[in-house]
């Protein structure tokens, strides 16, 4: 639907767009019912009331229909804001980080409830977020933006597993980076050679991989030199620090060959002492090679 061009403009109130603000922006002087019904301008009074009750029942807040925003918790206010945005049956919903003001446990529950309601309503949604988990959890399609431009767009799995540059990798998680030079369509690193098809010889590239794809050889930890494999994928490193993060441990290493820092995530509890010697490998099928000028 065209809403604006050089000679034509639809007023905002007639664009059939729902908007859900980051801070909910409920009207404090209006009841819950009047907040939800604020955008309902058509239909009889009975029809508008029925729509208000339908939405409040759907968000499990019908009991607060005559209450006021200050009587509600943050999660309840969020659900009222959702009902208000959906009441006029918009063609599209714009959501500006609507869950950022909620605590973590409540945020997960509210996100799932909101997604279910939006699916039931059949409303298209454009959601703005800086949270990668939220994007993966909510979206059918993700668009990554940088400097006001879309740099990558696609299904969550594709965007995560086929990033277009270093910054796209880093949006979803911490990223380890190895700098290398290409020779004969191969990038040569301490972890061996990586394919760099179509990249001219002499080009500097970054090999980028996530911490969960840096692997520790536990059988050789703290022992003598590891026999080098045919492509030289094993590398020696020293533990700088280790932290328990709840479901996993984060271990930071200083690489022997150049003093660079790499990070690995390990399931459960793994807290080696600083100074411990480890041998590392990477999952080569989970590494991405980007020319430095396109590293993001």
Write out the residue ranges for each language-model feature.
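Short alpha-helix capping/helix-loop boundary micro-motifs
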Residues: 262-266
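C-terminal boundary and immediately downstream tail of ABC-type ATPase nucleotide-binding domains
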Residues: 161-183, 208
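OB-fold (S1/OB) nucleic-acid-binding surfaces
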Residues: 188-192, 254-259
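Short aromatic-glycine-enriched beta-strand elements
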Residues: 248-251
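ABC ATPase NBD Q-loop/coupling interface
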Residues: 1-16, 45
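Glycine/charge-rich catalytic "coupling/switch" loops of P-loop NTPases
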Residues: 189-243, 268-296
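ABC ATPase nucleotide-binding domains
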Residues: 16-18, 22-167
């Amino acid at each position: 639907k065209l809403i604006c061009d050089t000679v034509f403009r639809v007023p905002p109130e007639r664009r059939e767009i729902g908007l859900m603000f980051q801070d909910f922006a409920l009207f404090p002087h209006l009841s819950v019912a009047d907040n939800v019904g604020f955008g309902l301008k058509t239909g009889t009074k009975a029809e508008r009331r029925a729509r208000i009750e339908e939405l409040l029942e759907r968000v499990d807040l019908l009991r607060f229909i005559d209450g006021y925003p200050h009587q509600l918790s943050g999660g309840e206010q969020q659900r009222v804001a959702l009902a208000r945005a959906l009441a006029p049956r918009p063609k599209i919903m714009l959501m500006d980080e609507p869950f950022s003001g909620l605590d973590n446990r409540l945020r997960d529950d509210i996100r799932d409830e909101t997604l279910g309601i939006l699916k039931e309503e059949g409303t298209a949604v454009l959601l703005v977020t800086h949270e990668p988990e939220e994007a993966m959890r909510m979206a059918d399609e993700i668009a990554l933006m940088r400097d006001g431009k879309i740099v990558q767009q696609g299904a969550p799995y594709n965007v995560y597993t086929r990033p277009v540059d270093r910054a796209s990798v880093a949006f979803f998680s911490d990223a380890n980076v190895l700098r290398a030079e290409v020779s004969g369509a191969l990038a040569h690193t301490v972890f061996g050679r990586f394919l760099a098809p179509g990249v001219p010889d002499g080009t500097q590239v970054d090999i980028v991989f996530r911490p969960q794809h840096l692997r520790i050889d536990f059988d050789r930890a703290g022992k003598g030199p590891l026999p080098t494999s045919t492509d030289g994928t094993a590398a020696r490193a020293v533990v700088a620090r280790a932290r328990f993060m709840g479901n996993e441990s984060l271990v930071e290493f200083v690489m022997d060959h150049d003093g660079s820092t790499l990070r690995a995530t390990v399931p459960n509890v793994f807290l080696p002492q600083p100074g411990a010697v480890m041998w590392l490998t990477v999952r080569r099928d989970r590494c991405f090679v980007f020319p430095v000028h396109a590293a993001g």
